[in-house]
Regions:
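Amide-donor transfer/coupling interface in amidating biosynthetic enzymes
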Residues: 11-114
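Catalytic nucleophile loop
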Residues: 1-5, 11
Length: 114
């Protein structure tokens, strides 16, 4: 929707199945929020484990021409969250927050509604 491009199969670049290790089941991996972003305001700046199940991702250089910026990364260089800093709440994450116990993203979304 933002005009970015999709990396079709992450294991081809990263060499592991870390983002989708067991077919049909969520796993967890660590992401690190970028300081100064909405994601870091909501989740903190320290690395955190998130529920994951994906083999695709947004190409890291494909949003340079948009208002979006990446706001969390996996250690292998895969973008894990992006946001539009000019919007009230436009955040996209590559992980599955609905599959975990951490409701902070959902609470922040609800709180952003006027």
């Amino acid at each position: 929707a933002a005009g970015g491009a999709v990396e079709q199969h992450l294991p081809d670049r990263v060499g592991t199945e870390a983002h989708c290790p067991v077919p049909g089941r969520y796993a967890a991996h660590s992401v690190t929020p970028v300081a100064g972003t909405r994601v870091s305001e909501i989740l903190g700046a320290a690395p955190l484990d998130v529920p994951t199940y994906h083999h695709q991702g947004v190409l890291a250089d494909s949003l340079d021409h948009t208002a979006y910026r990446f706001s969390a990364w996996h250690a292998d260089g895969t973008p894990e969250a992006m946001e539009d800093p000019g919007s009230r709440f436009r955040i996209a994450v590559q992980w599955h927050p609905e599959a975990g116990a951490d409701a902070r993203l959902f609470r922040a979304l609800v709180a952003s509604v006027p």
